[in-house]
Design a protein with these regions (language model features):
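Exposed beta-sheet edge and beta->alpha loop/turn motif
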Residues: 50-116
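Core segments of small alpha/beta cavity-forming domains
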Residues: 1-46
């Protein structure tokens, strides 16, 4: 359920996450995230043009957490790890309706920051 964070998320990200959550429900899966720790957040890119529609800021997020998926019916872990792992992600913020909101999260090894 994304409702707890909707005021911080772009309309596009809410739609994408709700779609993914819907597929997880069909597959009888549920995400589990535990012991989430933010270790560092560093801005790596900013773009500001007249108007708001193209403004964006990208942060490199370094964190540590336990993240896995369980089968809703059995409680069995179906993917992921039940031990803590370090992660690096790019978090892309955009201006939408006059405020900054999270629009995209990409894994560091999936993308060249210049292409974001």
């Amino acid at each position: 359920d994304t409702s707890y964070a909707e005021k911080y998320l772009s309309k596009n990200l809410i739609q994408n996450w709700n779609s993914k959550l819907g597929w997880m429900e069909v597959n009888r899966e549920k995400p589990v995230q535990e012991r989430v720790r933010l270790l560092n957040a560093a801005p790596v890119f900013a773009f500001d043009k007249e108007g708001e529609e193209h403004d964006r800021v990208i942060y490199l997020i370094h964190g540590r957490m336990i993240g896995y998926y369980i089968n809703i019916d059995t409680g069995e872990v179906v993917r992921g790890k039940t031990s803590p792992e370090t992660f690096y992600e790019y978090w892309v913020y955009i201006r939408e309706d006059g405020r900054w909101v999270l629009d995209e999260i990409r894994q560091k090894d999936e993308v060249d920051v210049e292409q974001l």
